[in-house]
Amino acid sequence: MQKRLLQLGLFTLLNFLSYAQESEFLGNFTPTISHLVPATASQVTPHQQIIKPNFKGRELIEVDQSNTHNPDWVWQQHATTEKIASASVMWAFQGLGTNMSPPDPTVDADSNVVIESTNSGGGAVYRIFNKNTGATIVSSLTMQSLGGSAGLGDPIVLYYKPARRWFLTEFSSSGNKLLIHVSQTSNPQGAYYTYSFTCTSFPDYPKYGFCESSDAFVASTNQGGPPTVYAMKLSTMLTGATSPFIKTTIGYTLNGFGFQSITPVDLEGDNAAPAGMKPLFIRHRDDESHSNGSPDSGTNDWIELWEMTINWTANTATVAKIQDVVIGEIDSKLCGLTSFACIKQPGTTNTLDPLRETVMYKAPMRVFDDHQTILAALATDVDGADRAGVRWVELRRASNVTTPTWVNYQEGTYAPGTGTSRWMPAINIDKFGNIIMAYSTSSNTAGDFPSIKMTGRKPCDPLGQMTMPETTIIAGTSSKTGDTRWGDYHHMSIDDFDQKTFYFTGVYHNSQTKTNVSAIRMNPDVLDASIANAFVPGTGTGCGSSTQIGVIVEQTGSTNITSGVLSWQVGSGAISTVNYTSTQLNGVGTTDTIYLS
């Protein structure tokens, strides 16, 4: 183990020196100010299927037909394990994007509403839902009405809780622009600042993330060659001031992939990132498929972490690979490395796009009291016969550090049963450490039409296992014919206020391509409690031998707690135990204070 850690540190140093990229300052951009305009009926529900031209570069690469497949040592082939979690769909409704190919749905929530956005015939449109019931508040609005250039789509919707602001984004139909609309207040139906950032070429597949510790709103795009990343100044965008726009490029492409993408890491929850943390970007590298980059191995593959260093005074930046984290073997050759056609459907020879090139949006990060977590999910060929499964990975490092010391805490490939493909995952984690993952499913078995399903796990479940039985969010009723485009991404967000409700939007097929918006919550165990906090009552300069400590116990299970046992240890001292009774632990989320002395 010590030898492996030493080697990892050496690789980190070499990659930093080899792959540091300088930036290009593209100028300062000042926003316009505008208000909402409803979308027209033709923008919301096109009568003819609309196919969005993007995923630049795939068509230029010859498909690799070689058949190298190493065993997937973390393949979860059975749906049930010794411990079972469960989740409930609180509500689910049809979303926007009907008959779009692809719809590219995205979703987030504030204290009152949920916003979903998709592609349409005239750029991105979005709908506002009641957060508690899922009822539609505003049927459909067009992002183009918010100002700037005409939009083309690829929307991403994000809510930034520290400032209570909405960020609505898409790319332009001409002029190579990223269009970013920032709400001037917490009201998503109020006025917006609209930024039009001009890129050096068409910014395909834009993905975004916040890094408050670097005062940055960052983006990644596919512009041909290595992925391009951008930095915008967060504090100025929140006030409607002029923002710098800084471009830099990831150090190298992944050979074989025509489409090059890297995903920004986006922080969830109220716990801040460590002071001085810089923006992170993440991608996977299947070294058998890509044959470039280092290190290289015949028995495992890699998660790459790249870090952006920004100088706002000089408007410059660099991006460098800081770490290669070992993961089990993945197989990116789902019908080769570039094909748009792979996933089987019932009753047709038409197959669907597997989206194997990218860590799917988004890559959430959450800070807990004793560690930091990043989640990643992607598609992999589980059997060498073009059946897709979902590889998911949880990276961890100690709390309050910014060093490149991430480790692979756990990983698994979710592909139970036989025949059915699972792809287009979206994953997130709540304040308790519960993980929910939703994805598309399909096979050529009769009735197994393109649908949306989910699984999940609790933090104390066996590592590498999704213990929640696969649950259908919405079942498809028909196969898609005519073209192979399915969706470029799904989106799973977390309620920033209760920090335990997951909001998901994804694609299914019911006579037409449609999207679904749903609210999901992990069910509590029947009898469970957790330590919410601890404190020293009163005031003083230090702890003496008889100092009393208060421990706040929170009920996290569904059964009320009337008594329990609490154990504690100071350093390497003896373990002490106290029996307690309670009349306050009478519902999920209720607390009681137990005093230790």
Language model segments and positions:
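Bacterial Sec-dependent N-terminal signal peptides
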Residues: M1-E22, C543, G550-V551
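Extracellular/luminal regions of secreted and cell-surface proteins that mediate adhesion/ECM remodeling
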Residues: P524-S597
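Intrinsic structural disorder/low-complexity segments
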Residues: L5-L10, T263, D287, G587-G589
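Short secondary-structure junctions and interdomain/linker hinges
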Residues: T12, D383, S399, G538-T541, ...
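C-terminal PAP-associated
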Residues: Q21-D525
